[in-house]
């Protein structure tokens, strides 16, 4: 009998031999918690435990070995039963020049610790701190200081021990953590000549602690907000916007995104890594900065999907495409986590770029570099990643004077096998900043990248930025929106188009020319962020005359229904007050990421390029409502409805006598209709996370707020209404000569 026949017989008699590959036991439940598997019960699969908030799993994870047995956690000698344990926060080891209460060995979630200073010392930081469910204290380190040193007393974070008690220029202090706590931040700090301590404040953390998205997003967002606000090339900065990931207007940013694709990362988690990176790319490209993006995935070996040396690394579409094409199975034969090799790929890119540009050239020396490392675990092959970081710092000549030219953000995800010490070693350490984080899961990572931009930090008049985070107010979402009124009654809306000019409708002013009685409310009128401005000058289009065609039987005509208001003072930019982008300007061109040499016609073709264009306006209550602007043949059918309006136009024979090409048209059944009082407000679109005003609300055939004093009450027109609702908005592309005449010194207009 031949060998193949023997094999066939064995498989026939013992079918279990065909699928006898080992798998790990399934008796791995955790008391009070749940678990997930990265690759089922097969060897190489990572089992990750989760517990309700305020508890942590012990052990955090287990690995299915090739033998079909679960790997014993490092901290235990035997395979112990997984349990959920209560989270505790570290206690103070010492508190200088004061007392704290209560004095416990550690503190439960929700527990407080209070601090008081001795006479002659002033308390800096938080007098009361509470233990949070993630094992971290809220607030700031409490310090009792008498101001006697060249640098302020650096304090002692909870759970830490400090050596060094002199705070003069050149003096150093050193920190270590007690018991099993892990130190993040700088273990040594030096008092510098400017009175500031070097490095980052050290924090002692429980090994199982993690960061909340709401803590990480501001830390990252502040960095990018400063960078974005500092790189608007159409504005001149009068003050420093801070350090952070900042590049000068003449400089360039290289952004390196490193995505862990090792075996411990599930396919779904890798997808969220990609989505988070795409969010970052989308948002950073939506601002007018000079940026090149590198994309590197890594497991046992790195794979460069996009290099900063490629011209298409400056093109958002190409970068996003590279991310979308990243395949989870690209690294299926490599199970390790070689963070060193990933960072070394960045170093090699830098080295090649330096050779191309020349080490001594300004073109090379003015490039700033930001590395964002997304990983779920500890480096376990290839050598220490710190070595690669040292090489990167060396090639960039990072010293005290050039510290701003490199930022490394190390973000661990999943708590499972993330090594706090390694992340802290890799992350940059700069005064007042954090660069190392651990998030509970990939969903938290996605939240961070979704909400990381804090637009209140953008102090330039960068246009078209709305805060789209879940907790933003209506005014923060549309910060250009303003209310125009006499001393009491609100009458119209408008839009900030610069820090001193408002665009609105001319018919708002037809009842009188004494603009000294009028006011413009900018920001949220219901909060401290609202401010009332006087009008220095009103510019009404001379072509506007609502009764211009009365002799033709057209009782109201709204051609040239456009006006500009110059405010008596400039508006301070904030998350509640910011101009919208006006098409056909250099500011809008940068926001659209269009090439130099683009024209006004190019903007119109990009923004109004469909038969039905989704757009928005702002309601009386501040909410954003949806409409569809009809273009081409659909514009004609939209406008034709006016012929059915016999009250305003009893003898109309030609619709174009009323609806000229100055107007955009909306109002089909799925659209909202503007109310009386919403006239003059912006009609706007969103492109690449920026907002562009293409029209302003002028007039319509239906008032959904008629008979109601409630700003939140709107009534849709019945389907049987004749004529059906139609709304008309001044098309800003048709008002270019007038806008250029009056705003030529305010905005930078493109050729028509």
From Swiss-Prot:
Cellular-component GO terms for this entry: extracellular exosome
One function term, GO molecular function aspect: serine-type endopeptidase activity
EC number(s) on file: 3.4.21.43
Motif range (MIDAS-like motif): 260-264
Enzyme class, broadest EC rank: hydrolase
Keyword set includes Lipid metabolism: no
Segment forming the signal sequence: 1-20
Taxonomic superkingdom: Eukaryota
Catalytic residues as annotated in Swiss-Prot or TrEMBL: 507 (charge relay system), 561 (charge relay system), 679 (charge relay system)
UniProt domain Sushi: residue ranges: 22-86, 87-146, 149-206
Cleavage, annotated site positions: 243-244
Domain Peptidase S1, chain residue ranges per copy: 464-744
A Pfam family assignment: VWA
Sites where the protein binds Mg(2+): 262, 264, 337
Glycosites: 29, 112, 290, 333, 467, 471, 621
Cofactor: Mg(2+); Mn(2+)
Post-translational modification, as annotated: Cleaved and activated by different proteases depending on the complement pathway to generate complement C2a and serine protease complement C2b chains. Cleaved and activated by C1S following activation by the classical complement system. Cleaved and activated by MASP2 following activation by the lectin complement system. Cleaved and activated by GZMK following activation by the GZMK complement system.
GO biological process: complement activation, classical pathway; innate immune response; proteolysis; response to bacterium
Cystine connections: 24-64, 51-84, 89-131, 117-144, 151-191, 177-204, 463-581, 492-508, 584-600, 638-665, 675-705
Subcellular location: Secreted; Cell surface
UniProt keywords, alphabetically: Complement pathway, Disulfide bond, Glycoprotein, Hydrolase, Immunity, Innate immunity, Magnesium, Manganese, Metal-binding, Protease, Repeat, Secreted, Serine protease, Signal, Sushi
Ranges where the VWFA domain occurs: 254-452
Family statement: Belongs to the peptidase S1 family.
Function recorded in the entry: Precursor of the catalytic component of the C3 and C5 convertase complexes, which are part of the complement pathway, a cascade of proteins that leads to phagocytosis and breakdown of pathogens and signaling that strengthens the adaptive immune system. Component C2 is part of the classical, lectin and GZMK complement systems.
Entry remark concerning the domains of this protein: The MIDAS-like motif in the VWFA domain binds divalent metal cations.
Identification of the protein by name: Complement C2
Origin species: Pongo pygmaeus
């Amino acid at each position: 009998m031949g060998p193949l026949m023997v094999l066939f017989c064995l498989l026939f008699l013992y079918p279990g031999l065909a699928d006898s590959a080992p798998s790990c036991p399934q008796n791995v439940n955790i008391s009070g918690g749940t678990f997930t598997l990265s690759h089922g019960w097969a060897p190489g699969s990572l089992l990750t435990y989760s517990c309700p908030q305020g508890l942590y799993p012990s052990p955090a994870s287990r690995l299915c070995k090739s033998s079909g047995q679960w790997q014993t956690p490092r901290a235990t000698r035997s395979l112990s039963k997984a349990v959920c344990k209560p989270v505790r926060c570290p206690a103070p080891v010492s508190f200088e020049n004061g007392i704290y209460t209560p004095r416990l060995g550690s503190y439960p979630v929700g527990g407080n610790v209070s601090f008081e200073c001795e006479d002659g010392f002033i308390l800096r930081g938080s007098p009361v701190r509470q233990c949070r469910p993630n094992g971290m204290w809220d607030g700031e380190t409490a310090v009792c200081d008498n101001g006697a040193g060249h640098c302020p007393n650096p304090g002692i974070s909870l759970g830490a021990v400090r050596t060094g008690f002199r705070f003069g220029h050149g003096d150093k202090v050193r920190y270590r953590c007690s018991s099993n706590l892990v130190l993040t931040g700088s273990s040594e700090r030096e008092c510098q000549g400017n009175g500031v301590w070097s490095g980052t404040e050290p924090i002692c953390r429980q090994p199982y602690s993690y960061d909340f998205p709401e803590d990480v997003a501001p830390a990252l967002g502040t960095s990018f907000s400063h960078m974005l606000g500092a790189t608007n090339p159409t504005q001149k900065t009068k003050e420093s916007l801070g350090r952070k990931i900042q590049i000068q207007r003449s400089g360039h940013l290289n952004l390196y995104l490193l995505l862990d694709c090792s075996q411990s990362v599930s396919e779904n988690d890798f997808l969220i890594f990609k989505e988070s990176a795409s969010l970052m790319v989308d948002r950073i490209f939506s601002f007018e900065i000079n940026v090149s993006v590198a994309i590197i995935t890594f497991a046992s070996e790195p794979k460069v999907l996009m290099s900063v040396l490629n011209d298409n690394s400056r093109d958002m579409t190409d970068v996003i495409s590279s991310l979308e094409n990243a395949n989870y199975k690209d690294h299926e034969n490599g199970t390790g986590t070689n963070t060193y090799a990933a960072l070394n790929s960045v170093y090699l890119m830098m080295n090649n770029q330096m050779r191309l540009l020349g080490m001594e050239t300004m073109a090379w020396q003015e490039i700033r570099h930001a590395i964002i490392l997304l990983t779920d675990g500890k480096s376990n092959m290839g050598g220490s990643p710190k070595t690669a970081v040292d090489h990167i710092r060396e090639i960039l000549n990072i010293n005290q004077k050039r510290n701003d030219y490199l930022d490394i953000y190390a973000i661990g995800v999943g708590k499972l096998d993330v090594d706090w010490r390694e992340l802290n070693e890799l992350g940059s350490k700069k005064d007042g900043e954090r660069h190392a984080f651990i998030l509970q899961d990939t969903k938290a990572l996605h939240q961070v990248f979704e909400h990381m931009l804090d637009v209140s930090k953008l102090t330039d008049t960068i246009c078209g930025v709305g805060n789209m985070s879940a907790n933003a107010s209506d005014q923060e979402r549309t910060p250009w929106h303003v209310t125009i009124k006499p001393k009491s009654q609100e009458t119209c809306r408008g839009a900030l188009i610069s820090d001193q000019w408002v665009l609105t409708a001319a018919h708002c002013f037809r009842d009188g020319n004494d603009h000294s009685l009028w006011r413009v409310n900018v920001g949220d009128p219901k909060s401290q962020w609202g401010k009332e401005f006087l009008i220095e000058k009103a510019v009404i289009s001379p072509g506007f005359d609502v009764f211009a065609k009365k002799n033709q039987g057209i009782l109201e005509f709204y051609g040239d229904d456009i006006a500009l208001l110059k405010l008596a003072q400039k508006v301070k930019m904030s998350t509640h007050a910011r101009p919208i982008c006006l098409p056909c300007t250099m500011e809008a061109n940068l926001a659209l990421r269009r090439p130099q040499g683009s024209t006004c016609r190019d903007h119109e073709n990009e923004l109004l390029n469909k038969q039905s264009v989704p757009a928005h306006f702002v309601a009386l209550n501040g909410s954003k409502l949806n409409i569809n602007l009809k273009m081409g043949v659909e514009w004609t059918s939209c406008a034709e409805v006016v012929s059915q309006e016999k009250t305003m136009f009893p003898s109309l024979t030609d619709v174009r006598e009323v609806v000229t090409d100055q107007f955009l048209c909306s109002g089909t059944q799925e659209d909202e209709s503007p109310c009386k009082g919403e006239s003059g407000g912006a009609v706007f679109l969103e492109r690449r996370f920026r907002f562009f005003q293409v029209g302003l609300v002028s007039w319509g055939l239906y008032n959904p707020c008629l008979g109601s004093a409630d700003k939140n009450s709107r009534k849709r027109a019945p389907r049987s209404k004749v004529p059906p609702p139609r709304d008309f908005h001044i098309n800003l592309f048709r008002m270019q000569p007038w806008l250029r005449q009056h705003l030529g010194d305010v905005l930078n207009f493109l050729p028509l």
